[in-house]
C-alpha cells in the first residue's frame, strides 16, 4: 500500500520545499498521534486529481450544475461502499470534516436552545459535543456526563440518571480520548427512555468498527457521524450515516444547502478509494493488529511505572497519566518529538493541570501499524518512550544524550518499515 508514490512537481519552491520537509518528517519519525494515520498512494492520487476542478452542488442525479456525470459516479460509489462498510441504509459523504458532520446533525434535529448531553471534554469528550467555546456549546443548553473517578469508565447508570434528570433532546455518544469500548446499545436504551435522539460520533473508532474489532454504532444510533481519517485510513473529511429514511432527508438538507455549498469531489473520490480498501479482508487483520499493538504499548508503559487511564485499552488509543513520574504532558510531547516520537499532550480525567500543560499524553497505534509495526515493535516503542520520560523525571529539560540515542533507534525502525518509497 505504501510502496509507491508518484511525485507531482510543484513549481512553487516555497510550498515544494515544505512538502518535501513534511514527507521527510513522516518517513523518519514514528507517528503516535491517535487521530492520525498514513493513507495509501491511491488515496493521495485520488485527492490530487482533476476532480478538484468540478463544482457539484447537490447530490448524484440532482445537481445544480452541468457536467456532473462522472462526479456523480464517484460520489455514488463512495456512498455505496460506506453503507456496505457499516451496514447502513443511508449515507452522506459530503461533510468536509467530522465537526461539519456533527454540526449538520445539530442543524437537522435541533433548534437553538435545545438541550444536548455529551461526554465532558475534560473526561475525554470532543469539542463539538458541547464545549462552551464551540457552536454546540454556544447554541444549545449543554449538560455533560463524566467517567467514573476511580475506573475512568463511562458509568451507564450515572448516564441514565443524568438523562432522566435533565431530559436532553439529543444524547451524544463518542469521544476523543476514551480508550475503551462504548456501550452503544445501552446509550440507545437510555435515549429511548427519555425520548432523545442518539447521535454516535465514531470518528476515532470507525476503522476498528469497519474491521469488525469494535462494536458497531450504526444499528443503535439514530444518526452516526465520523471522520474518514484516523483509524479508517482515508483522507481528512466527514460522513453521516442513518437507517431512518425521514432523518436521511433532513440530514442531506442540513449538509447541503444548510451547512455547506459545493462538495469537495476530489476528497470524496479519495474517501471512495479508502472505503474500498477498508472492505478488503486484510483490513480486518489491520484493525485487529492496531488494537493488539496499543495493548502491548500500554502494558510496557504500565510495567515502566506510568499510569494508564482506565488501566488499558480496547482500541487504538492509550491515554497515559504522567503524574507518577512528576512530568507534564507539555514537556513530554516536546521531548518525545525531539527524540523522533510524535504524540500530543492530553488532559486526563480530573486533571489538575491546565489544558495547555496537562498531566497526560495521548498515544495511538494506527499509523505505526500501517507502517507494518507489530507487537514487538510497539513494545520497543514503549521502552523508548520510557527512556525519554525517565530522563525528564530527573531533569525537566530532558537528557540530550538519551534523546539522541532514542532518535537513532527510531530512525532504524523507520528504515526497516519505510513508507512512500518513490
UniProtKB/Swiss-Prot annotation:
Question: Where does the entry annotate site (Plays an important role in substrate specificity)?
Answer: 229
Write out the GO biological process terms. Answer: glycine biosynthetic process from serine; tetrahydrofolate interconversion
| Metabolic or biological pathway | One-carbon metabolism; tetrahydrofolate interconversion; Amino-acid biosynthesis; glycine biosynthesis; glycine from L-serine: step 1/1
Q: Which domain of life is it from?
A: Bacteria
**Which of the seven top EC classes does this enzyme belong to?**
transferase
Query: What Pfam families does the record point to?
Result: SHMT
Reaction catalysed by this enzyme: (6R)-5,10-methylene-5,6,7,8-tetrahydrofolate + glycine + H2O = (6S)-5,6,7,8-tetrahydrofolate + L-serine
Give the Enzyme Commission number: 2.1.2.1
Alphabetical list of InterPro entries matching this protein: PyrdxlP-dep_Trfase, PyrdxlP-dep_Trfase_major, PyrdxlP-dep_Trfase_small, Ser_HO-MeTrfase, Ser_HO-MeTrfase-like, Ser_HO-MeTrfase_PLP_BS, SHMT-like_dom
Could you list this entry's UniProt keywords, alphabetically sorted: Amino-acid biosynthesis, Cytoplasm, One-carbon metabolism, Pyridoxal phosphate, Transferase
Molecular function per GO? glycine hydroxymethyltransferase activity; pyridoxal phosphate binding
Question: Positions modified as N6-(pyridoxal phosphate)lysine?
Answer: 230
SUPFAM superfamilies noted in UniProt: PLP-dependent transferases
Q: Name one GO cellular component term.
A: cytosol
- Indicate which residues the UniProt annotation says bind (6S)-5,6,7,8-tetrahydrofolate: 121, 125-127
Cross-referenced Gene3D superfamilies:
Aspartate Aminotransferase, domain 1 (3.90.1150.10), Type I PLP-dependent aspartate aminotransferase-like (Major domain) (3.40.640.10)
The protein's required cofactor(s) are namely: pyridoxal 5'-phosphate
* Record has Cytoplasm as a keyword: yes
Kindly list the places in or outside the cell where this protein is found, as annotated in its UniProt entry.
Answer: Cytoplasm
The cross-references to PANTHER family, in alphabetical order and at most eight, read: SERINE HYDROXYMETHYLTRANSFERASE (PTHR11680), SERINE HYDROXYMETHYLTRANSFERASE 1 (PTHR11680:SF35)
HAMAP family per the UniProt record, alphabetical: SHMT
Assembly mode: Homodimer.
Question: What family, per the record?
Answer: Belongs to the SHMT family.
Role description? Catalyzes the reversible interconversion of serine and glycine with tetrahydrofolate (THF) serving as the one-carbon carrier. This reaction serves as the major source of one-carbon groups required for the biosynthesis of purines, thymidylate, methionine, and other important biomolecules. Also exhibits THF-independent aldolase activity toward beta-hydroxyamino acids, producing glycine and aldehydes, via a retro-aldol mechanism.
Q: What is this protein called?
A: Serine hydroxymethyltransferase 2
**Organism ancestry:** Bacteria, Pseudomonadati, Pseudomonadota, Alphaproteobacteria, Hyphomicrobiales
Q: Which gene specifies this protein's sequence?
A: glyA2
Amino acid at each position: 500500500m505504501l510502496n509507491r508514490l508518484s511525485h507531482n512537481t510543484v513549481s512553487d519552491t516555497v510550498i515544494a520545499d515544505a512538502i518535501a520537509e513534511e514527507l521527510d518528517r513522516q518517513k523518519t519519525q514514528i507517528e503516535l498521534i491517535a487521530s492520525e494515520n498514513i493513507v495509501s498512494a491511491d488515496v493521495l492520487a485520488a485527492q490530487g486529481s482533476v476532480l478538484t476542478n468540478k463544482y457539484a452542488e447537490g447530490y448524484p442525479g440532482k445537481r445544480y450544475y452541468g457536467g456532473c456525470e462522472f462526479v456523480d459516479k464517484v460520489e455514488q460509489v463512495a456512498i455505496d461502499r460506506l453503507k456496505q462498510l457499516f451496514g447502513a441504509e443511508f449515507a452522506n459523504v459530503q461533510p468536509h470534516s467530522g465537526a461539519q458532520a456533527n454540526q449538520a446533525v445539530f442543524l437537522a434535529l435541533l433548534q437553538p436552545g435545545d438541550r444536548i448531553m455529551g461526554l465532558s471534554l475534560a473526561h475525554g469528550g470532543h469539542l463539538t459535543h458541547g464545549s462552551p467555546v464551540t457552536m454546540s456549546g454556544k447554541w444549545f443548553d449543554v449538560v455533560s456526563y463524566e467517567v467514573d473517578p476511580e475506573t475512568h469508565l463511562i458509568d451507564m447508570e450515572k448516564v441514565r440518571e443524568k438523562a432522566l434528570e435533565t431530559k436532553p433532546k439529543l444524547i451524544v455518544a463518542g469521544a476523543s480520548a476514551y480508550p475503551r469500548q462504548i456501550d452503544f446499545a445501552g446509550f440507545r436504551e437510555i435515549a429511548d427512555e427519555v425520548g432523545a435522539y442518539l447521535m454516535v460520533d465514531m470518528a476515532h473508532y470507525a476503522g476498528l468498527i469497519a474491521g469488525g474489532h469494535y462494536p458497531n454504532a450504526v444499528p443503535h444510533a439514530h444518526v452516526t457521524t465520523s471522520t474518514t481519517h484516523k483509524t479508517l485510513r482515508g483522507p481528512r473529511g466527514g460522513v453521516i450515516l442513518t437507517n431512518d429514511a425521514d432523518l436521511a432527508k433532513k440530514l442531506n438538507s442540513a449538509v447541503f444547502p444548510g451547512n455547506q455549498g459545493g462538495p469537495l469531489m476530489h476528497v470524496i473520490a479519495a474517501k471512495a478509494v479508502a472505503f474500498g480498501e477498508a472492505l478488503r479482508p486484510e483490513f480486518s487483520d489491520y484493525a485487529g493488529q492496531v488494537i493488539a499493538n496499543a495493548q502491548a504499548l500500554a502494558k510496557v508503559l504500565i510495567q515502566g511505572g506510568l499510569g494508564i487511564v482506565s488501566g488499558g485499552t480496547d482500541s487504538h488509543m492509550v491515554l497515559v497519566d504522567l503524574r507518577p513520574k512528576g512530568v507534564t504532558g507539555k514537556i513530554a510531547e516536546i521531548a518525545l518529538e525531539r527524540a523522533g516520537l510524535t504524540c500530543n499532550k492530553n488532559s486526563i480525567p480530573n486533571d489538575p493541570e491546565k489544558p495547555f500543560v496537562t498531566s497526560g499524553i495521548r498515544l495511538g497505534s494506527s499509523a505505526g501499524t500501517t507502517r507494518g509495526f507489530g507487537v514487538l515493535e510497539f513494545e520497543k516503542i514503549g521502552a523508548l518512550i520510557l527512556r525519554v520520560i525517565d530522563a525528564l523525571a530527573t531533569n525537566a529539560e530532558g537528557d540530550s544524550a538519551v534523546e539522541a540515542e532514542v532518535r537513532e533507534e527510531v530512525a532504524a525502525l523507520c528504515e526497516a518499515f519505510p513508507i512512500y518509497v518513490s
